[in-house]
Amino acid sequence: MTSRDAARQAMQERILETTDRLFYGQGIRAVGVDTIAAEIGISKRTLYNYFPSKEALIVAYLSRRAVPRTVSDRPPLEQILGVFDWLDRWFASKAFRGCPFVNAVAEIGERSHPATKIAVNQKERRRVAFRDILTGFGVADPDGLATQLTILVEGAMAAALVRDDPAMARAAKSAARVLLTAAGVTADDDKSTVRKPNSLRRASKSPRQSEKPGPAPRRRRS
């Protein structure tokens, strides 16, 4: 990479960091390109050399927040419940302003907008992450349970914003435990296992399922 390329990359990252802070903290509609440029100390023309429009900035902002899931060696049940622990820490942050993806969809209001598609994909990514872990447990309906857990996450974010109460994450975690227990998922000696109801057990197989690795949440994005 040449020094020129490095300088351009650094400026692009600086623009994105500033855009992220302003869009998330003040709202996409409330913040114009001129505000972002002034905050950085560059002209609008210079900013447009990196991002040709505000729409491009919006897409880049959400794409940057839509961090792909990563594989973790933590026990699967910890990975699921750990999402709610992460929410608890996020909700307690002074910077918490709700889900950036929900906020963006509400502000933009266009189902066909690229930003809306990014938001939908991000939400589905979390649901699929839950489903993959639950499939490893061998629960009867991993897809349905993954959807229910996702709803708990989404509801916790909305409630925490409205009530200004981080405890919503802990309440959602308790509800998640109820759902998981009902599905036969338990924790035993720090190893996640599943105990199927009698009607679902097979005589030829043990009710205990082997632990399988799954995705872990990244802290900074939601």
Predicted segments, located by residue:
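C-terminal peripheral helix-coil segments that are non-catalytic and often amphipathic
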Residues: M1-T2, R89, E124-A140, A159-S222
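Amphipathic alpha-helical packing segments from all-alpha helical-bundle domains
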Residues: R69-L81, R111-F137, G144-T147, S174
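Amphipathic, non-transmembrane alpha-helical scaffold segments
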Residues: R8, Q12, L16, L62, ...
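Basic, helix-initiating cap at the start of DNA-binding domains
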Residues: M1-Q26, A30-I42, A56
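Hydrophobic alpha-helical connector segments
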Residues: A60, T70-R97, A146-L149
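Alpha-helical DNA-contacting segments of helix-turn-helix folds
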Residues: F51, A56-R65, S72
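Amphipathic alpha-helical segments used for helix-helix packing
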Residues: S93-K117
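Short hydrophobic/aromatic patch on the recognition helix
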Residues: I40-F51
